[in-house]
Amino acid sequence: MIRTLLIIAAASLVACVLSIGGFLAVGGVDAIRNGEFEFGPRHWRTDSRHDHDGRHGRMRDAGPTISRTLVWNGTDRLQVDLDADIAFRQAPTASVTISGPKGLVDQVQLENGRLRLADRGTPFHFDHDGRDLRITISAPAVRQFALNGSARLEVADYDQPDLALSIAGSGEVQIRGKTQSAALDIAGSGEADLEGLTLAVARVSVAGSGDARLAPTDSADVKIAGSGDVTLQKRPPVLSSNISGSGDLNFED
């Protein structure tokens, strides 16, 4: 039994050495020296200034700044699964314009109201801080917004009977306009500033350390689990709250 285990261990060691040798042979030394790869227990990450060319681990520059327009029919839901600065404005005509480094802009896809970066089918990830991509969107009837990650979304001229906003991660959202009711869900450390949104009824759920600011005039239902904060511009006539953890419900008045 011991002999078998020793044989397996020796074979694993040989395989590991061969794998590292292969990586170094195809340019791994230069990549490590230049800081283009980070080794971790779960993944390798490319330096944010480069992109993977899909051949053998070498990197290429993300390219010049360009603009690109996407075709969109303007559904009632917008889901953001990438890191970017996004400006949304309610308007009669739907349009999407993306600007940033060519290597990033060319990867942006919009399918069924979902913004994301294309999967290139490699174990390498092009890392960026979200400031590289700027996306301007207009559409007539979006009523649901979902942010996954650390995107920043600013919504202007919102005018719909209701609003549903969810943030998963550390995203930031600011919405200005008017609606009758709003449902806000934050999971993580995201921030939602809805003080510029005129509304009557609000339902707020914060799980984690997120922060929400609203100004409902008639009623509010607030649930906090964790260390999150919810600030209401004033105490509405009807208010219910459930707080578990160190979170706070505050009033500005």
What is each stretch, according to the model?
Residues 70, 78, 96-98, 117, ...:
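Preference for bulky hydrophobic residues occupying beta-strand positions
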Residues 173-253:
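Short, surface-exposed interaction patches in beta-rich subdomains
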